[in-house]
Amino acid sequence: MLKQSERRRSWSYRPWNTTENEGSQHRRSICSLGARSGSQASIHGWTEGNYNYYIEEDEDGEEEDQWKDDLAEEDQQAGEVTTAKPEGPSDPPALLSTLNVNVGGHSYQLDYCELAGFPKTRLGRLATSTSRSRQLSLCDDYEEQTDEYFFDRDPAVFQLVYNFYLSGVLLVLDGLCPRRFLEELGYWGVRLKYTPRCCRICFEERRDELSERLKIQHELRAQAQVEEAEELFRDMRFYGPQRRRLWNLMEKPFSSVAAKAIGVASSTFVLVSVVALALNTVEEMQQHSGQGEGGPDLRPILEHVEMLCMGFFTLEYLLRLASTPDLRRFARSALNLVDLVAILPLYLQLLLECFTGEGHQRGQTVGSVGKVGQVLRVMRLMRIFRILKLARHSTGLRAFGFTLRQCYQQVGCLLLFIAMGIFTFSAAVYSVEHDVPSTNFTTIPHSWWWAAVSISTVGYGDMYPETHLGRFFAFLCIAFGIILNGMPISILYNKFSDYYSKLKAYEYTTIRRERGEVNFMQRARKKIAECLLGSNPQLTPRQEN
């Protein structure tokens, strides 16, 4: 808020006399607007700059009825006031032709006839109101000696509002904040319904762009830092402080040395499990671990390594689940869903293997066992999703996922165009190639693979048209793929670069704040000094430093 003028006084109620009411009914129709002389600031001219007209559809109906009810109430109160004979001299009618306002230290004189033309605005209601209490409720302060109304608002925006009362057109300065400008317009009650709507486009574009940037900034901050509710940990009935320390240990890797060690161990186990999953398919690496007391162990060594990794992932997930302050937020988190998908296939596979073993003992049909085997292969395939656990420790992966969420419309359009191209060109090539002897374009579904490879500009060469018309369609398909791949990639890359840099900056700020409590370099120097002091106790304090 701007400071009010030093000449402001406390509110003082003064009843209006009959002369004032009569003078208000015979106001001059001239619209004399000008600045007051003396210590007050003069009226500024229209500010130079880039302006845009702004329109907002007038909301009739409830607002119109409310305005009529207010006027009826004010007329009734005015009739009660005029019944009493006022005391003291009356003001000249000439002084009642203008309304004196002071906005942020700048004084203005507005003609009553201009304000009465916009009775729904704040100054219009102030000018047309006959109740002093109603007038005082519309302003911040009132000075009786100079008959001046004070408002603690932005004078730069009111200059545009003042020009609106003068010309009937609101000019929007491009340098103003859209949200701040709309807030000021809401306070003054300016509706602006007589300006062409086409001039509103520039202002709406800036407003929408600002809203989108603020939304993205909020989501990026939420991605960069773990939102924890202090009151939730404080109000927990069961082991609140212990769960808070465990939460910091699992979710904030830079809050302590132990948390950093757990983060490094988690990334290491992810890489080891992925390597073990890949090497487990190599026949030379499938060596048995030996024989135990219960008989030969048929599981390879790499499967034992994978089981160890899955045990760590399970323990990590359970600790996060036990320490979370909000189960709903935990369930909605994408990273926690990835953790669950990473460990769930192994337990489903073990469960199905148990049922499969019982089925063999009971002599079930081969068909049912074969179906279970297919399900087991799908479960094994789902284990590759555990590599997505690296997104918890990788800024680039999280920025890539955030980019896909923000650009889902562009990605959807890209997939739609690719599908349309595949269906169109595969049907076209099939129509001219299916009669060729020993052709690979036997059906349209068989042609989909060729169209997909051609649109992606890969070109394996396993399928190719032989007729001249088919080659012409192939050229069109490749050209369509080049144009299609070039349009959205630049947009996605620019947004990914922007989101990655912002997310990296927010993460750096969060890490610096978390490291404020734990200074690893200072702790390392302290440990080295303690070791040196233990090996040579004759060191002086100066030598220790």
Swiss-Prot record:
Q: Which residues lie within the membrane without crossing it?
A: 445-465
> Which residues does the annotated region (Disordered) include?
74-93
All ranges on the Extracellular side of the membrane: 177-261, 358-374, 432-444, 466-471
Q: Mainly localized where?
A: membrane
Q: Name one GO molecular function term.
A: potassium channel regulator activity
What glycosylation sites does the entry record? N440
Record InterPro entries: Ion_trans_dom, K_chnl_volt-dep_Kv, K_chnl_volt-dep_Kv5/Kv9, SKP1/BTB/POZ_sf, T1-type_BTB, VG_K_chnl, Volt_channel_dom_sf
Q: Which UniProt keywords apply?
A: Cell membrane, Cone-rod dystrophy, Disease variant, Glycoprotein, Ion channel, Ion transport, Membrane, Potassium, Potassium channel, Potassium transport, Transmembrane, Transmembrane helix, Transport, Voltage-gated channel
Q: In which tissues is it expressed?
A: Detected in lung, liver, kidney, pancreas, spleen, thymus, prostate, testis, ovary and colon.
Q: Which GO terms describe its cellular component?
A: membrane; plasma membrane; voltage-gated potassium channel complex
Q: Which Pfam families match?
A: BTB_2, Ion_trans
Q: Topology relative to the membrane, per the entry?
A: Multi-pass membrane protein
Q: Which residue intervals are topologically Cytoplasmic?
A: 1-155, 283-336, 396-410, 493-545
User: Where does this protein reside within or beyond the cell?
Assistant: Cell membrane
Stretches that traverse the bilayer: 156-176, 262-282, 337-357, 375-395, 411-431, 472-492
Is Oxidoreductase one of the keywords?
Answer: no
Motif annotated as Selectivity filter, chain positions: 457-462
List, in alphabetical order, the GO biological process terms annotated in this UniProt record.
Answer: action potential; potassium ion transmembrane transport; protein homooligomerization
Q: Implicated in which disease?
A: Cone dystrophy retinal 3B: A rare form of cone dystrophy associated with supernormal rod responses. The disorder is characterized by reduced visual acuity, photoaversion, night blindness, and abnormal color vision. At an early age, the retina shows subtle depigmentation at the macula and, later, more obvious areas of atrophy.
Relate the protein's function as given in its record.
Potassium channel subunit. Modulates channel activity by shifting the threshold and the half-maximal activation to more negative values.
Known partners and oligomeric status: Heteromultimer with KCNB1, KCNC1 and KCNF1. Does not form homomultimers.
Domains: entry comment: The segment S4 is probably the voltage-sensor and is characterized by a series of positively charged amino acids at every third position.
The entry assigns this protein to a family as follows: Belongs to the potassium channel family. V (TC 1.A.1.2) subfamily. Kv8.2/KCNV2 sub-subfamily.
Annotated protein name in UniProt: Potassium voltage-gated channel subfamily V member 2
Look up and give the organism this protein is from.
Homo sapiens (Human)
- Phylogenetic classification of the source organism: Eukaryota, Metazoa, Chordata, Craniata, Vertebrata
Gene this protein is translated from: KCNV2
